Design a protein with these regions (language model features):
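Carbohydrate-active catalytic/glycan-binding domains of CAZyme proteins
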Residues: 17-115
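Bacterial Sec-dependent N-terminal signal peptides
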Residues: 1-20
Length: 115
């Protein structure tokens, strides 16, 4: 009987642990970096194209919300192409945005440690 309870629990546990309100449902993203300013959450993510074998990350995206339920996509906010000195077309990893002295700075790590 104990084994039956364990089996039932092992099948039900994934249902309870799954996300009930995924923020981004139409694109592949990674490395979410939230920033709260006034009454808005700004969510910066790296963007993985779905047409590649492995990964193809060339740009960064922005999403915002004032209630953490409804999100607005603002599209690409920066791309590897924006940095002429970057000789790569893949590797747009984990962004981070910070506010300092009433200015916002988007930190974008570059491939192979050149940034």
């Amino acid at each position: 009987m104990k084994i039956i309870h364990i089996l039932i629990a092992s099948f039900l546990l994934p249902l309870v642990c799954s996300g009930q309100n995924p923020i981004i449902q139409t694109k592949y993203t990674a490395d979410p970096a939230p920033l709260v300013y006034n009454d808005t959450v700004f969510l910066y993510t790296s963007h993985d194209e779905d047409d590649a074998f492995g990964f193809k990350m060339q740009d960064w995206l922005l999403y915002t919300s004032t209630d953490m339920v409804n999100w607005t996509e603002h599209g690409v906010i920066a791309s590897l192409k924006d940095f002429r000195w970057v000789p790569y077309d893949n590797g747009a990893w984990a962004p981070q945005c910070v506010r300092r002295n009433n200015k916002f700075y988007l930190y974008c790590p570059m491939p192979n440690g050149i940034g």
